[in-house]
Regions:
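Active-site bordering "gate/hinge" segments
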Residues: 1-214
Length: 214
């Protein structure tokens, strides 16, 4: 028996599944990435180098920061530009903002309902309103972090080759610190919740191509 699912819900992007069962044994189980061609290389050709980070950011509305910073760092490497510790720190904050936003969305709203056998996310929200508020507050903090450092939440503009177009003030950095302290207890509560979940005993061999290529 062959199984084919062309669209899997609750993932960031588009994916499918192909499986085959013969005499009760699973002989194939394969996840398919169904992302279409982006053709960014062709779009970037012959464009001014200062435009590349904003064009590359359009690869994704959920994770534009990583594409922005990757294109900037690639150009800095090509030009031999070295940045200072302040720039590195702010880029790390910017990247953390995206990760916090994305992970809060994915872990709570995409994954948690399945662990509790709840098919409807609205039922999850009604059953665990306090955890829902924690997840939303954490996600909002991630958005705020990207906005304050990057200039706006989606497709941030501030990062550029060599540094930032506009540097955050001391007041903004202190506000980020204050907001981080506010959401930390909720993050700990959610962490304890996920620590109690029963995870499947799954072991997979990985090639780690992107890591070994560094």
């Amino acid at each position: 028996m062959k199984i084919r699912i062309d669209h899997i819900a609750k993932i960031e992007g588009h994916g499918g599944f192909v499986g085959e069962i013969i005499k009760g044994d699973v002989v194939q189980a394969r996840f398919m990435v169904n992302e279409g061609a982006r053709l960014l290389e062709g779009i970037l050709r012959d464009r001014h180098y200062e435009e590349t980070s904003q064009i590359a950011a359009r690869i994704c509305g959920v994770c534009p920061v990583v594409h922005t910073l990757t294109s900037i760092k690639a150009l800095e490497a090509a030009m031999g530009v070295e940045v200072g510790s302040e720039t590195i720190f702010l880029r790390q904050l910017l990247m953390l903002g995206q990760l916090i936003n994305s992970h809060a969305l994915h872990l709570f709203f995409f994954s948690l309902a399945d662990f509790f056998g709840i098919k409807d996310d609205l039922k999850l929200i009604k059953k665990y309103p306090a955890y829902t508020k924690d997840a939303l507050a954490i996600r909002e903090f991630g958005n705020m972090l990207v906005e304050k450092i990057g200039g706006r939440t989606i497709h941030p503009l501030a990062a550029e080759i060599g540094g930032f177009k506009k540097w955050p003030s001391k007041q903004i950095l202190l506000k980020i610190k204050k907001e981080a302290e506010k959401v930390l207890p909720g993050a700990i509560r959610l962490g304890k919740l996920f620590a109690k979940l029963k995870y499947p005993d799954l072991q997979t061999n990985f090639n780690w191509a992107s890591v070994t290529a560094l």
